[in-house]
């Protein structure tokens, strides 16, 4: 025959698959699981081993003769077990130890189902159980097989005694006692059910335990007599209670179960020892004393029947339901108690939302929705939507409402509706005019004086003299910072002076100074007289309607003629008081300080006549005199306060920028917290460099200032985009002409904003035919890397005025071949750019005849062409000159020389009166007496 599976062989032999696998492994047969195959020889070996083990573990057939005999045997076994204690088995069959095997009990024995474990008892008679034996599953099929074998060879009573099948009755008794007895102290299964429902469900039909008998209880819970110990320490049932042995039910000792009811589910009995390492399934059971004999457990089939009837130890049994029901009832009682307590407790009243009164007037904006109106009216949006629905208007809470709908809703509520008027906070000019016209709480203020005049007429010298005479007296450190504006004190009265440059490029700065000034001091040199910038300053002052005080300077110089200056100024409407006019003339010498105090007195006199006043209690407004980008402070602006008082921390909008005044510095370089009217200060804290002559206004809060500044910046950007020239049919021809023009791209960086504007204006006025200046970027501050990058991308020239490039910018410029020109004098910057513009024009060339040659002889040469021999009649002829062949006054050919020789040598030049030989490149039709003109193209300089 062929091979057979392990599970087929186990089925034939009525044994467990695991028993067959264990025997096969002991015999050295390779099997892995119940699906492994064995041949006939291996099958015979396993059969023989099964027969030997069945015969070896069967107890004597006379083991159950008398109870007294069993008691003696049990006593002997107790003595023997005390000498060699080992872990006791938790299964229904208590296995014998090594001492019992040594006695070689030869009595007939029935086949036993389980592998016996070694049993130990302590000195007080308690049995020590092993964890591994308590939880070891048991096969029902094996139990049936063993029982059938025992019936074949022995009586039913001996068979039950040998295999320990009395546990069925014991288990039933325990189950009955669990269901009927309210005292749980001795009820092992009931405690076990309450604490380990899940584990009982898994191991109901697989575990067999040996509970400890309780003293003084000779009968079971149902009144039946307890089984007595037979021969070999085994229990024997009465004949009437013998049943077919089934798979045994797991029963715990009573005392262990009572402890387990108070422990977590995962705990094990603490009095445990490891099970024996030897294979104990087929060893002989050890005798147990009668006092410590375990209660017999019921078979698995009986337990299954009990489970179906609702009894037994199953999770679906009666006792388990009873235990769970008690817990459920306890929870029910607790829940009902809590519910009654909650009902009897006083209920807290829910806070009611207070109805806020309606406003007297609804200030609305067109486009508001129901949510926005609900916040103003203190009503829910749903209420407003319902009202509008009743009024015939269908809207939702996010829909914008028009003016009529909002007024209709206000009328329904019985309140007035008023549309909110928006003010353009970004219109600084309007705010500036309103603040300047404020006539409340006016107080006298210092006059603002602007000094104007031509270059080198002594304006700066006069200011320096005023500062050193009236400012630095009593100042320890002197002037620490130059901000272009100063205050001079005379007789406890202050005068504010503004300096303006005299060069023609600074027209805007002069006009700006005239706009913000109260009095103009016109400085005219007595030796030079009236100059172009003097006339321009007069026009600016007259346009601003500012009174003019003429200071005739340099009267100490030889050749000075103040009267001639006065005569010249009368042509422009400046008539001296001595001549019947109203213009004040003061003859001074700024270098020596002559008549300086007289000039100051005249200024104060004119200020008294003007009655200059301002309100220091309102929000400050003023004008930017100068602005720059400081390396450490950031954007810095020099401003002149014209109305109100400027405080540190005020939210401010300056031109198209905004910020908060972080710090203020006066003309002495000292920090101040307040700036009164007519006081020049330098402020920091703005986010960008403003333009000169920009207005500044202080706002109530920073949020409004930010909104106004951002709006102004946005409008300025849009305006700049609008200024871009778009091509139309009207300007198409002009655009095409401009496209033919060459451009010089320039980037301007200067120290102050006024210099930037002056230099840009001067460069744009340079007139070179065919070339124009294109300023692609202008800013305040040092030349940085971004400027160099922009110049490299646009092929532009960087012009720095009183600034220097950073180290990184300089290195990058050298790497990118960017031209950086640094200047401190505006004349030189303008001249250099003008020269560059002229150099960008395409050069103009004109022809110049340098010599003539008369052909005397022609010699045709193969592979060379016609060789000409002749004399230089006039001038000279060079190798790289152009030639023109003229025959009878008609130009036959114009080209280049192919070669030029004198005798056999190649030469570069042949002068007049010398013979030569030459060839004309790519031309051979040359005849005797032809004239050859040599000429060159020379570049004509740009005028």
From Swiss-Prot:
Primary location class: cytoplasm
Region (G4): 553-556
Region feature G1, mapped onto this chain: 453-460
Residues reported in the UniProt entry to bind GTP: 453-460, 499-503, 553-556
Sequence ranges of Polar residues compositional bias: 130-141
Annotated region described as G5, given as residue ranges: 589-591
Basic and acidic residues bias spans: 92-103, 110-124, 191-205, 239-250, 259-271, 346-358
InterPro entries: EF-G-like_DII (IPR053905), IF2_II (IPR044145), IF2_N (IPR006847), P-loop_NTPase (IPR027417), Small_GTP-bd (IPR005225), T_Tr_GTP-bd_dom (IPR000795), TF_IF2_bacterial-like (IPR000178), TIF_IF2 (IPR015760)
Keywords carried by this UniProt record: Cytoplasm, GTP-binding, Initiation factor, Nucleotide-binding, Protein biosynthesis
Residue stretches of biased makeup (Basic residues): 331-342
Location in the cell: Cytoplasm
Domain of life: Bacteria
Ranges for region G3: 499-502
Region (G2): 478-482
Annotated stretches, region: Disordered: 35-359
Pfam family, one: IF-2
Compositionally biased tracts (Low complexity): 57-76, 142-190, 289-299, 315-330
GO cellular component terms given for this protein: cytosol
A GO MF label: translation initiation factor activity
Start and end residues of each tr-type G domain: 444-613
Reported function: One of the essential components for the initiation of protein synthesis. Protects formylmethionyl-tRNA from spontaneous hydrolysis and promotes its binding to the 30S ribosomal subunits. Also involved in the hydrolysis of GTP during the formation of the 70S ribosomal complex.
Family named by the database record: Belongs to the TRAFAC class translation factor GTPase superfamily. Classic translation factor GTPase family. IF-2 subfamily.
NCBIfam families associated with the record: IF-2, small_GTP
Protein's UniProt name: Translation initiation factor IF-2
UniProt organism field: Lacticaseibacillus paracasei (strain ATCC 334 / BCRC 17002 / CCUG 31169 / CIP 107868 / KCTC 3260 / NRRL B-441)
Lineage: Bacteria, Bacillati, Bacillota, Bacilli, Lactobacillales
